[in-house]
């Protein structure tokens, strides 16, 4: 392979690395849990990480139980699971 071809390959690999989302193995395991509204009656807005869409989404939380994939703010969700 010529040096020009190697440089092109190196550039493409670098671009791929920058544009590829963070690997799921770098996230806490609870980020992969489905959102869980819980059994109570207090409907409040919360956020959860959706691993299919690689983003944090809003859901209605009942105020008790549920699971750890439950954040009060979208920023907290992003800091924990989306980075």
Swiss-Prot record:
Start and end residues of each BPTI/Kunitz inhibitor domain: 31-81
Protein name listed in UniProt: Kunitz-type serine protease inhibitor superbin-4
Molecular function per GO: serine-type endopeptidase inhibitor activity
Keyword list, A-Z: Disulfide bond, Protease inhibitor, Secreted, Serine protease inhibitor, Signal
Function as written in the Swiss-Prot or TrEMBL entry: Serine protease inhibitor.
Stretch forming the signal peptide: 1-24
Locations listed in the record: Secreted
Expression across tissues: Expressed by the venom gland.
Entry keyword annotation includes Repeat: no
GO terms for cellular component: extracellular space
Site (Reactive bond for trypsin): 41-42
Organism domain of life: Eukaryota
InterPro entries per the UniProt record, alphabetical: Kunitz_BPTI, Kunitz_BPTI_sf, Prtase_inh_Kunz-CS, TFPI/VKTCI-like
Disulfide bonds: 31-81, 40-64, 56-77
Keyword DNA damage: no
PANTHER family associated with the record: BPTI_KUNITZ INHIBITOR DOMAIN-CONTAINING PROTEIN, KUNITZ-TYPE PROTEASE INHIBITOR-RELATED
């Amino acid at each position: 392979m010529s040096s020009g071809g190697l440089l092109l390959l190196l550039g493409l690999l670098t671009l791929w690395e920058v544009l590829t989302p963070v690997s799921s193995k770098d996230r806490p395991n609870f980020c992969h849990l489905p959102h869980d509204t819980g059994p109570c009656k207090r409907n409040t807005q919360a956020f959860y990480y959706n691993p299919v869409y690689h983003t944090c989404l809003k859901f209605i939380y009942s105020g008790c139980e549920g699971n750890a994939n439950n954040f009060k703010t979208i920023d907290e969700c992003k800091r924990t699971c989306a980075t």
